[in-house]
Amino acid sequence: MGLHLGQAIFLLFAAGIAGTLNALAGGGSFISFPALLFVQVPGVTANSTNTVALWPGLVASTIAYLKRLKAPLRVLFPLLVASAAGGGAGARLLLKTPQHTFLRLVPWLLLGGTLLFAFGNSIRAIAGKTTVIDDLRHTSWQAIMASSIAQLLVAVYGGYFGAGIGFMTLGMLAMLGMRDIHAMGAIRTLLAAAINAAAVVTFIVAHAVLWPQCTVMIAGSLAGGWFGAHYAQKADPRKVRGVVIGVGLAMSAYFFAKVL
């Protein structure tokens, strides 16, 4: 399908905002995914195109956070493998979902992601009833295995839809005993990039991406992701979260009205 200038500008700004939000607090898909639906992209194709478009922004955020990434390889590697495996599985599941079925799932997915985002700190608090061990060098293999299984489940959801996975990952890291939010943010963005990398490859191989729309959004998400990662510490996270939750609820209500 074609792309008009007005649509291109709209998608560029939507992806820029989404990339910034993903770096600041997560939840960027609450902006960029509905934006694709608003320009008449079919549901499954909109989701796959959105995933590919936002991935470069995640990579940009990951690079910006590298100085905070201090987790040992024995912890990171199993989590990365689980992320990639789950992301690919979730993406393949999405491609097998009929368009009309997915469109009926959209408001539920948006609402579920919004609630997960809204109560993410509570999830972290519940998961974090453990000894504080921001130094992960002495993490037991049992803890690493349990966290990897949890991350695999997060990644399947992430490959399928993905809104709210950041807080699920933060909850998993809290289970390991981490408390340094910036160190946790660095791992969160890395694992999200791994989840979406597997999904991106799956979608591209399956020819499930609208490239005119995707290319415009990649430019926006790159700029937004880099900006958000560098200015994350200056933003008031409570205000950012409030905006994201408000948008998520509004989008959920809009799509519920469309399908009911």
Language-model-detected regions and their locations in the chain:
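Membrane-interface alpha-helices at helix entry/exit sites of multi-pass transporters
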Residues: 41-51, 74-75, 178-189
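Selected transmembrane alpha-helices and immediately adjacent juxtamembrane segments
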Residues: 1-42, 129-185, 215
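Hydrophobic alpha-helical transmembrane segments in multi-pass integral membrane proteins
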Residues: 90, 151-160, 199-207, 214, ...
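Selective hydrophobic functional segments
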Residues: 48-108, 196-246
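Transmembrane helix exit motif
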Residues: 60-70, 91, 108-136, 252-260
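Residues within membrane-spanning alpha-helices of integral membrane proteins
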Residues: 8, 51, 106-110, 114, ...
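Hydrophobic alpha-helical transmembrane segments of multi-pass integral membrane proteins
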Residues: 112, 186-199
